[in-house]
């Protein structure tokens, strides 16, 4: 389809190429061209090129769509195995997307009332660590389930969004302003921002969970060569710090849990029973205290003047 053509699909169509439909710009309801998949309609193996639009209305379904840069899919029905090669997928209320692969500055927008499952994110982190670029990768305001974030991939979970069962590999990251549940960091990073919560995160070798001022993490497990950083004003409770795991924090944070010595805590300016190793660090600020601290190989205890 080209030159403002329009295909309305009530039955089944295969192998179409769409290069028109976005005359009014991305994700604009004023667009009327392109391929429209209606209730009961199915489109398979569609190619959407620059300027092209595939619109999937409620009750419609598509599979194996490939979207290049400048093309988009407006989804209110179901989409399976969409590949975004620089293209965009906009999920509207009621939409379900399964198996989307996001490449080469592609963008999946998971809006409230939508569910994205088994997404693979290979782009979004090109702007550097924890950059709020927000227009590549996966942008979650609904529900994202079983997402895999690879090198250069980024998932941004906004305040109203939830990410469940995410795996983050080295070079990828997850930025949390909403809720993240059951994240596994296999060398990847998780940033928990003010108002964000992360529950049951597992930090494996070279992984890093950073809990910022106003962020909250619960039930984090830090395995050997993993790292948990809790900034001033951040909170991490029920931490399990395994031997060889690193805790980086200060007495201006709140951290509780267990390590190989037993229960430890950093609460209201008082640190007790903290183990520091493998890059672990505790800054004891002026007027604060630390008792029973154990500093092993690679650990640092910094006591400020008056601490």
Tell where the protein language model's regions lie, with residue ranges.
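Surface-exposed intrinsically disordered loops and tails
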Residues: 26-28
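Calmodulin-binding IQ motif alpha-helix
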Residues: 1, 203, 222
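The right-handed parallel beta-helix/beta-solenoid scaffold, focusing on the short coil/turn
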Residues: 4-6, 11-16, 21-22, 33-35, ...
